Amino acid sequence: SPSRDKVISLCLALKLEFPETQRALTLTKNGQLYSKNKRDSILIFAFGKKLSVIDTNVLLEEMNEPVLN
C-alpha cells in the first residue's frame, strides 16, 4: 500500500477535507494525523488552509520538520 506521506500528498493535491484525509489514511492502513505530533499538527494546519503540496513542504521545512516525500 502507499506510504503515509504519499497518501497525505495526494489528499492535499486533491484538496480533500481533513475527515476525508483521515479516512484515506485508515483505508490505506496508515496512521491518522495526530494533533499532538508537531509534524502532524503542521499538516493538519495545511489541510485547514488548503495549502498545496509545495507550500506545505515549504512550511514543514521552515519548521524544521521532514518534508513530504
Tell what function each PLM region has:
Residues 1-13:
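Short, basic-rich loop-to-helix N-cap that marks the start of a DNA-contacting helix
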Residues 12-15, 29:
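Generic short alpha-helical segment signal, independent of protein family or function
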